[in-house]
Amino acid sequence: MGRSASLLRLRDPAPLPTDIAPDPAEAPPSPAADRRVIVVTGMSGAGRTTVLRALEDIGYEAVDNLPLSLFEALTQGRWDQPRPLVLGIDTRTRGFHAATVLAAIERLVAATGFDVRLLFIDCDDEVLVRRYTETRRRHPLAVDRPLADGIALERALVAPLKERASRCLDTSILPPAKLRAVIEAEFSLDHRPELAIFVSSFGFRNGLPREADLVFDVRFLANPHYEPHLREMTGLDPAVAAYVAADPDFAPLIDRVTALLALLVPRYEKEGKSYLTIAIGCTGGKHRSVYTAERLAAWLNETGRRAHVRHRDLKETPR
């Protein structure tokens, strides 16, 4: 089956014969009904449960591991729920088979005309191995085989779902707080989804952040590392902040970067971009990039947007 940008809207429901009055029990849903359904699936350990909880917190009705036999019940009767529905399905679901899941979704769309979307949560294999190793949880398909083999088997089983997904979300570089923010921004029910903005400091010696949309190199600023009394501090400490801010190149840098963001951010919002990651890099990701990221995030928040800060190479909780 080919890839579909808008999942499985194969055909409209067949019209009722004109000479037969519709059964009241099969009447169309009330205008207040919400006909959206999101089916969340993907790799075990990738964050599917976090996504379900985030959707539930913003107003979706969430059902996890619904047996596929009960999934079929959604095609029956009248739909008058005021909240959209999110269904969690994975390889532990009773009767799971990718072809069965896709067929059930097709029948649901054909019988009801619901706006059904498949959200696939993915993650790199090496990250999954690390997550399972660190938490000491057992992978559902690695009960009698090595962890890596269980992950490989699951990836093969869910491959058809990933191919047909409306949206694939890779969580390899998304900590839980950032994943929740992405979901809240993209699937908000209260208003047009807002642009979720993340400002991340990093050290070039540890590599570029894979998730970065915009990268700014601040290694030209004076380096606090060479000041013995500042070396063990970070850009979160007032003394380091004052040192970086005193560099005569710092103010022009902030002026030009904020001017660029003032141009770009509204245009990203207009085109419907879901999230934007701005990465600020210095040599070690400890001093200059940290303070610069804090300043840019503060400016973004002052403009009325919500910017989340993460210091990749500091042992710091994202916020």
Swiss-Prot record:
Entry annotated with the keyword Repeat: no
Superkingdom field: Bacteria
GO molecular function, one term: ATP binding
Region: Disordered, residue numbers: 1-34
Keyword terms: ATP-binding, GTP-binding, Nucleotide-binding
Pfam families, alphabetized: PapZ_C, RapZ-like_N
Binding of GTP, residues: D90, T91, R92, T93
InterPro entries: P-loop_NTPase, RapZ-like, RapZ-like_N, RapZ_C
Chain residues that bind ATP: G42, M43, S44, G45, A46, G47, R48, T49
Similarity comment: family membership: Belongs to the RapZ-like family.
Function per UniProt: Displays ATPase and GTPase activities.
NCBIfam families cross-referenced by the UniProt entry: PRK05416.1
Protein name in UniProt: Nucleotide-binding protein Rru_A3448
Organism of derivation: Rhodospirillum rubrum (strain ATCC 11170 / ATH 1.1.1 / DSM 467 / LMG 4362 / NCIMB 8255 / S1)
Source taxonomy: Bacteria, Pseudomonadati, Pseudomonadota, Alphaproteobacteria, Rhodospirillales
